[in-house]
Regions:
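A short Gly-Trp-Pro
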Residues: 1-133
């Protein structure tokens, strides 16, 4: 069970599934939404995610995409698309070290002064689809 929430504690969540798609995204939308040079995300099935306290504010940042954040302190919490999955900001976890990133995505939009030096795979856009078996 993964648990986390916003800076002020008004909004809390739990994720009852193993995380996947652990990444650091460098796209302009994520950077702007979080106010940082990149943002670490992990994904869980939407059915395994629930809000435990508070109700986050929501903003449709692009067609089919809903970003949720604390209306009190502004902490960015989730990104929901149309795949039945929810991306959660890794650093909003109570223990963010428990879910390390596996790669960097959208590095074509990476800021020139944001140097990646961790040796993880880096993809200019999203990560490539798994090879067909």
């Amino acid at each position: 069970m993964l648990a986390g929430g916003c800076l002020c504690g008004a909004v809390r969540y739990q994720a009852a599934a193993a995380p996947f798609h652990e990444t650091v995204c460098h796209c302009a939308d994520c950077r702007r939404a979080v106010g940082a040079s990149a943002v670490a995300w992990f994904t869980v099935p939407l059915s395994a995610f629930r809000w435990m306290a508070g109700t986050p504010a929501a903003f449709q940042s692009s067609p089919g995409v809903m970003r949720r954040f604390c209306a009190v302190c502004g902490t960015s919490l989730t990104y929901e698309g149309a795949l039945g999955e929810v991306d959660v900001t890794t650093c909003s976890l109570d223990d963010p070290a428990a879910v390390p990133p596996r790669d960097h995505t959208h590095t074509a939009a990476q800021l020139p002064w944001d140097i990646i030096g961790d040796g993880l795979p880096a993809y200019p856009q999203g990560r490539p689809a798994p090879a067909e078996a």
